Amino acid sequence: MTAEEFLQEALSHEDKLITDRRYLHAHPGTEFDIQDTLAYVKKELIDMGYDPKECGKAGLVALAGGKKPGKVFLLRADMDALPMPEEADVDFASTNGKMHACGHDMHTSMLLGAARLLKAHEDEICGTVKLMFQPAEEVFEGSNDMIEAGVLKNPDVDVALMIHVMAGMPLPTGTAIVCDGGVSAPAADYFTIRVQGKGCHGSMPNNGVDPITAAAHIITGLQEIHARELALSDEAVLTIGTIHGGGASNVIPDSVELGGTIRTYDEDVRSFLKTRMTEIAEGIATSFRATAEVSFGSGCPTLTNDADLSACTVSYIRELLGMQKAFTADQLNAMSGDKKAPKTAGSEDFAYVSQKVPSIMLALAAGTPDAGYCYPQHHPKVKFDEAALAQGSAIYAYTAMRWLSEHC
């Protein structure tokens, strides 16, 4: 079968891909709490003839091929949504206060589509394709949970690929941007800072210790790390995303809790940032007669892309979609007049897989601003062009089959 025939076969399943995606979009779950999604994906795989196995807290694994000896190619899709109400103008919007605002419903639908293609061509697969349906990417816990449960073993994975759709890119839907070799996504760490004071009546602040004032100064102080303690080359982002404290306008509360994330590309910078955040928060709190406790929660390392796998992937996608539908990030940037592609500031827990086996991450354009896809990921009004679904499913399946055939 030619690449063109393979693409046409993928396009013939477009209606089913859209049906899958819209069900998943309308029934989102978050973190590991994705029962509706899990049940749907499992049933679809069984109906195709797979024998899906649960992996970790809420993951699924299925195998295609295995009839011929060869290597193992892992394809990964994340399944979780975000804890935010949807405002997108679509008929299939979610109504449960959660939303697929990052496109994970698209990823899951595409991998189901790839599973359908792989099953139809199972006798042609040299080796095995392992399908990884993963929960809890948004909290950076799902990938590592599945790794600890053995997703990369039995059979042992040789290489891995993930796709992430991107809305609002000025590129035709279905254009693939393949990460170059090296680090493409930063390490990420969630943190909380609990500032403990002493509550009192708002008219008599002298009788208490105001944690809100201390927290405000801590927020300001933390910004000085980047401004005055990191070198220009020390790429890092520190964001406070939540502030919780108090319940009445005339009462100074006992405590305030801040929450946020840090993103870094270098482990030394990551460690330094954590140390200084703790020192600054504790020091400022003490100066206001309060105390501060800094804790770091879930996170993920940097995502490292394999240069050889990147080159192969670009070549395969060009066979499938054409020369103008696949670029490395550096190639795309050179076309725009810049010499080097900027790194993304968004983290991705597929990084855990990339630390274990040669891996590649690619972005798939899913709607231009001119066509009305003007909101970014994580926005309550974001929408994705479903025309990317068939192309994404074809990329998943074709890339795996081509790589396996060349590396038997």
Describe each PLM feature range.
Residues R76, F191-I193, M361-A366:
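Non-cysteine beta-strand/loop elements that form the S-adenosyl-L-methionine
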